[in-house]
Structure formats: structure tokens, C-alpha cells
Amino acid sequence: MSNVTVSVFTLDKSISEEPVLPSSFIPSSGNVFPKFTSAIPKTAWELWYFDGISKDDRSSIVIGVTRNAEGLKHGGFKVQVFVIWADERTWHRDLFFPESVVSIDESGATEGIWKHATSSSSISFSCAGDLSKASLVFDVPGIVQGDMHLEALPGDTGLDTDATLGPSVYYVRPLGRASVKAQLSLYSSDATAAEQFILGTSANGGMDRVWSPLSWPQVMTESYYLRAQVGPYAMQIMRIFPPKGSENSENQPSTMARLYREGQLICAPQHVVTRDDALITHDSLILSKQNTSDSGDAVTGEYRDKNTGYTVEFVGKGNEEQRWEFQVRHERIIWNTPTSRPGPDATGNTGFVERLYGGTIGESYEGVGTGGQCELS
């Protein structure tokens, strides 16, 4: 067997009361192996995120695999599973496993398993060392069983660009653009037989790796996430607003956004600007909320932010002619999760199936994606 490095987390031994420094970011790498290898402080977190959506029937799947101190409340490290069928039915479970083991061999191939030995249940993932593919296996009898497969699409990866999201978060996309297949058997609490979920044809998605030594409330007050395919364009966006008094002294929003055309990276914003900014010296993102509906049947989140979508603009550095604009409209709700107490000013986290159209001047491509918006305060 080749040399293997292993990170083993157990709930009773791996949450630290003391500060723990993460291992270093590795440039031009997927950084799939954990950054907190033996213990994680109570504020820190690590996320392995996978998603896929069918452009044909809008079925979608979203998986979040985490290590953080939240497990102390629930008896395990969390894996979230969300699906939405073509007929808009949804299924969601937060599953908790007391043991998490991730290994990497000398080729860079990484395997992770979140498991419960007593119940013989687990959810696992693997990622090839060359980042050509990734897979997940779900084996939680009576709840979810099946698999999900991602295969990297040809072209640029974007891994040689800046991976910071503000001063405190690393945001890496090991498979930022991938074809996706999934087939799951899903059980509801009132059902004796499983429902089958098969991700529709022509599905695209990807895998993200995100970590920070600071908790989400220390990092942001609001966020928007998007991964979409629109004609020849693929886009990936994460944008956050920092809390007042954070390390972001100017209290400016941060982004880690990428735009590809036919597999070629054409714009890589790390800066959020407005249309009023006179001189744009870096690749930049303009992200504006929309609150209009042409048909009167607008889809919004359940909480106080009632926007119906966004206008997304990618602007090339120093060149106003390098501008790509896309309209994003919320089409379906995948999840609504509160982040505050109920009430008229309640905040929350909403996942969407997004419908998009746009391009550069003279273009009008259409496409779909998965989006998520969150308010914490």
C-alpha cells in the first residue's frame, strides 16, 4: 500500500477548547484533505459541498459534508442531503455521525467516510488525485441509500487563481464544472417504501471545498451562492457581506466568482463593485437584487429577504467592453431553514433552482443553476 495520511475525528476527542491552527493552503490544488487534521476549535468549520442539476427537468441534488463543533449538540458530524424532483417535491435530512475519517494517498486521491459503527450506517466520498472525478456513497438504511458521481468537464479549472473569500475563508472548487449523475432511494418518516430519485439527464454541477477558523456569524451577515450553466457559459459565485467590526475593516462585500465560456476561464472576480464605480482595475462582480415579477407568481424565500432574483454582471478589468450580464430568477424552492426566531423580521437560509438568461452584448442564452441565499442578522 502506498503512503497514506489519515485524519480521524471522533466527537468526544476532536473538538478543541483551545485554538488550533489549520494546515496551509496548497496553491493550484483541490485542497480536499482536511485542514484541521487532529482536532478543530469550536469556532472553526470545514465543508465538502457537492451539487448537481438537470437542465431538462430541473431535478437537483445538494450535499453538504461538514466537520465543526455543531456535532456536540447533535451527537455527530453533520451531512446534509437535499433533493428536489422534477414535480417540485423535496426531501431533506440532516444526518449526524459520531466518527469522521478522511485519508489521502501519495497520488492525492482522497477518501472520506462519516460513519456510525453501532448502526452500520455511513456516507462516504472519494476524489481522484488528478481531480478528474468524485463520488459519494449513501448507506443509511431506512433513510437514504445510493450514489452520486461527478466527472470534471474539460477546460480550465480555475485552481491557479486566488482562493480567498475575504480575509478569513478559503473557497476552493476541486471540480468547479462537472457532469453529474445520481440515483438514491429516499425514505420519509411516514412511508414504508423508498422513493426513487434519479437526477435527470444533462445534469451539471460541481464540488466545493471551504474552510475557516472563524464561525459563519464571525465571517458574514449575508451571502449568495450560485453555480449555473447558461449556454456556453458556466459561472460560480460566492459573495458575502462581513459583520461590522470584522477583519474586513472597510466592511466591503467579498466574492470568489468565476465565469467560463466553452471551458475557458474569462473572468475571475475577487472584488464586488457597483455600477457607479468609475474605474474598474480588477475583474469584478456586480450583484444586484431584483424584486419584480413579470407574471405575478414570483418565487421568494420564506424570510424577510423577499427578492425574486438577481442581476449578475461580470466585468473584465479595465475594459468596459468585457462585460457579461445575466438575469437570475428564483424558479423553485429546494429548502427553507431559519437562522433566527420566527417573526416578521425573521432571517433564514433558502436554496433555489435558478433560471438564468443573458450573456455578453447581443447574446441571450438560457440556462439553470442551483442558488442559495442566507441572512444571519
UniProtKB/Swiss-Prot annotation:
Protein name stated in the entry: Diels-Alderase fsa2
EC number: 5.5.1.-
Listed GO MF terms: isomerase activity
Coiled coil: none
Any Pfam family matching the protein: DA_C
Family membership noted in the UniProt record: Belongs to the Diels-Alderase family.
The encoding gene: eqx3
Domain of life: Eukaryota
Pathway field: Mycotoxin biosynthesis
Species this protein is from: Fusarium heterosporum
Reactions mediated catalytically: (5S)-3-[(2E,6R,8E,10E,12E)-2,6-dimethyltetradeca-2,8,10,12-tetraenoyl]-5-(hydroxymethyl)pyrrolidine-2,4-dione = trichosetin
Transmembrane segments: none
Keywords linked to the UniProt accession: Isomerase
Function: Diels-Alderase; part of the gene cluster that mediates the biosynthesis of equisetin, a trans-fused decalin-containing tetramic acid with antimicrobial activity. The PKS module of eqxS together with the enoylreductase eqxC catalyze the formation of the polyketide unit which is then conjugated to L-serine by the condensation domain of the eqxS NRPS module. Activity of the Dieckmann cyclase domain (RED) results in release of the Dieckmann product intermediate.
